[in-house]
UniProtKB/Swiss-Prot annotation:
EC number(s) on file: 1.4.3.5
Pathway: Cofactor metabolism; pyridoxal 5'-phosphate salvage; pyridoxal 5'-phosphate from pyridoxamine 5'-phosphate: step 1/1; Cofactor metabolism; pyridoxal 5'-phosphate salvage; pyridoxal 5'-phosphate from pyridoxine 5'-phosphate: step 1/1
Stated name of the protein: Pyridoxine/pyridoxamine 5'-phosphate oxidase
Organism this protein belongs to: Escherichia fergusonii (strain ATCC 35469 / DSM 13698 / CCUG 18766 / IAM 14443 / JCM 21226 / LMG 7866 / NBRC 102419 / NCTC 12128 / CDC 0568-73)
Chain residues that bind FMN: 67-72, 82-83, 88-89, 111, 146-147, 191, 201
Protein family membership: Belongs to the pyridoxamine 5'-phosphate oxidase family.
Amino acid sequence: MSDNDELQQIAHLRREYTKGGLRRRDLPADPLTLFERWLSQACEAKLADPTAMVVATVDENGQPYQRIVLLKHYDEKGMVFYTNLGSRKAHQIESNPRVSLLFPWHTLERQVMVTGKAERLSTLEVVKYFHSRPRDSQIGAWVSKQSSRISARGILESKFLELKQKFQQGEVPLPSFWGGFRVSMEQIEFWQGGEHRLHDRFLYQRENDAWKIDRLAP
């Protein structure tokens, strides 16, 4: 098969979205209510990693970057994730806190996109979550200088074993370079696939202490 033939096959990959629509009359006033419902349904459907979300940031040149992290908490203040503070995403957030989140629940023919500003979590919040993690995950946080170049995986594995020995007694201390961010919710868009590509999209936009809801064309 030629590269062109393979490209033509990709171009024709498509399917109809038939799992149901989203109507204005069914929308709650608070988008968190709908988000919680959809997340619960994603969990009930046993999707792989239902809390996985794409975090998009931009560097000082305006170049976008994306990566998948796990949502660890959400409430009216925002959506929370944890990371190495020396990572590329953390540095980019420090210089430009505007980020976008995307929950790609493909199996349910749904997406949720959140845009807002990211801010660092308090040390108290970080410590509480860090010590709730499995012990090996706590040690793993010490191992990697995230986004730095390394010559082989063996370097990480050797470092892990070294630190596991070092921290075998007592609590694993919180690394100074490990923390988290809370992304405020300025806009939340809910997307539900529809037949004939007539998808349903609703945008919640914060206006003072309330939410304005608009239907968007697909």
